[in-house]
Amino acid sequence: MAENGKNCDQRRIAMSKDQHNGSLTDPSSVHEKKRRDREERQNIVLWRQPLITLQYFSLETLVVLKEWTSKLWHRQSIVVSFLLLLAALVATYYVEGAHQQYVQRIEKQFLLYAYWIGLGILSSVGLGTGLHTFLLYLGPHIASVTLAAYECNSVNFPEPPYPDQIICPEEEGAEGAISLWSIISKVRIEACMWGIGTAIGELPPYFMARAARLSGAEPDDEEYQEFEEMLEHAEAAQDFASRAKLAVQKLVQKVGFFGILACASIPNPLFDLAGITCGHFLVPFWTFFGATLIGKAIIKMHIQKIFVIVTFSKHIVEQMVTFIGAVPGIGPSLQKPFQEYLEAQRQKLHHRSEAGTPQGENWLSWMFEKLVVAMVCYFVLSIINSMAQNYAKRIQQRLNSEEKTK
């Protein structure tokens, strides 16, 4: 493994020497070398170079731990204050007394908020490929509440076990008592907390670009470097992706708060560029974060909630199952597992999971569980690849700086 890493380093040194003797000062040569370095880093993935990837991942982990240890060491007063606060909270949590009823209530709400905020941060913070937690967690939760609300004619699910498990209340509501607004209100906390998490996850690109602009230093971030290149070659942009990025940049720069609000409210993959743009042009923090928070946690979240609730409303689901059954040839065989799944969910809601249909696992549930596991595993693999590529970039930058000093 060490020999593979050494050979990889030697290839980089050879490439650097080939481009030395003044050629690196030429802008086209610099751009070409950056492209080659980027392509070389992109090849450092587990399925192509597993040993080097794991080695670089381990070394990058040690570097990051060392950096954070150094930062915490230079902020000893903050660390000590945090530890004292934590000790006081632990003592309050474990000491018996009349306050325990409030402690339990606060603990329940804190864990609920932390869970959904954490999932929101994972969705947008930019670790690896990003974990699509709306599709994996929040969307299915809203769909489950919607199906249960129409089946029970109520959203007053017993707590506990809600939200871990949904069962119908003893006194079910009248037929037609469920409205779109009642379901929206039921899942408002979870959805808003998830939206707040996604807004928090958009802060790193903003802070990175702002710090780079104030210090005048070039940050160690490819997205920011691409952003600067895009600004330099704005007139020559021809492809759709470049023109879309420029449109987002101009909207945010010229319109300000409402431009950021519009970008945050509409689902789009280019919002990271809005954060970089705001940081680069020194947009005030509360202007950026306020617009992002309102857009993601309120406007965008309600759009997504309404879409899921309407899609999984009772009559729409029944029409979808009927439509599947109408497919020539394979319709009935495809329709059966959907009907079995819906029937099993109804029995669970009415406390009848032990009777009626057999409890063999439905293949729809099995497929979704395996999909969740696969996406989480891919997310972890992407983090390993990303950290390994970060370490490779450190090596390339060190070699480039050594070449410049020769």
UniProtKB/Swiss-Prot annotation:
Highest taxon of the lineage: Eukaryota
GO BP: autophagosome assembly; autophagosome membrane docking; autophagy; cell junction assembly; cell-cell adhesion; embryo implantation; lipoprotein transport; mitochondrion-endoplasmic reticulum membrane tethering
Segments on the Cytoplasmic face: 2-77, 131-250, 295-305, 385-406
Reaction equations catalysed: a 1,2-diacyl-sn-glycero-3-phospho-L-serine(in) = a 1,2-diacyl-sn-glycero-3-phospho-L-serine(out); cholesterol(in) = cholesterol(out); a 1,2-diacyl-sn-glycero-3-phosphocholine(in) = a 1,2-diacyl-sn-glycero-3-phosphocholine(out); a 1,2-diacyl-sn-glycero-3-phosphoethanolamine(in) = a 1,2-diacyl-sn-glycero-3-phosphoethanolamine(out)
Region (VTT domain): 173-316
GO MF terms held by the record: phospholipid scramblase activity
Extracellular side: 99-109, 272-273, 327-363
Region (Disordered): 1-37
Disruption phenotype: Mutants show early embryonic lethality with lipid accumulation in the visceral endoderm. Intestinal epithelial cell-specific knockout show accumulation of lipids in intestinal epithelial cells.
Location relative to the cell: Endoplasmic reticulum-Golgi intermediate compartment membrane; Cell membrane; Vacuole membrane; Endoplasmic reticulum membrane
UniProt membrane topology term: Multi-pass membrane protein
GO cellular component: autophagosome membrane; endoplasmic reticulum; endoplasmic reticulum membrane; endoplasmic reticulum-Golgi intermediate compartment membrane; nucleolus; phagophore assembly site; plasma membrane
Spans through the membrane: 78-98, 110-130, 251-271, 274-294, 306-326, 364-384
N-acetylalanine modification, residue list: 2
Basic and acidic residues biased stretches: 1-20
Keyword vocabulary terms for this entry: Acetylation, Autophagy, Cell adhesion, Cell membrane, Endoplasmic reticulum, Lipid transport, Membrane, Transmembrane, Transmembrane helix, Transport, Vacuole
Subunit details: Interacts with BECN1. Interacts with TJP1. Interacts with TP53INP2. Interacts with TMEM41B. Interacts with ATP2A2, PLN and SLN; competes with PLN and SLN to prevent them from forming an inhibitory complex with ATP2A2. Interacts with ATG2A.
Family: Belongs to the VMP1 family.
Domain description: The VTT domain was previously called the SNARE-assoc domain. As there is no evidence that this domain associates with SNARE proteins, it was renamed as VMP1, TMEM41, and TVP38 (VTT) domain.
Protein role: Phospholipid scramblase involved in lipid homeostasis and membrane dynamics processes. Has phospholipid scramblase activity toward cholesterol and phosphatidylserine, as well as phosphatidylethanolamine and phosphatidylcholine. Required for autophagosome formation: participates in early stages of autophagosome biogenesis at the endoplasmic reticulum (ER) membrane by reequilibrating the leaflets of the ER as lipids are extracted by ATG2 (ATG2A or ATG2B) to mediate autophagosome assembly. Regulates ATP2A2 activity to control ER-isolation membrane contacts for autophagosome formation.
Protein name: Vacuole membrane protein 1
Organism: Mus musculus
Source taxonomy: Eukaryota, Metazoa, Chordata, Craniata, Vertebrata
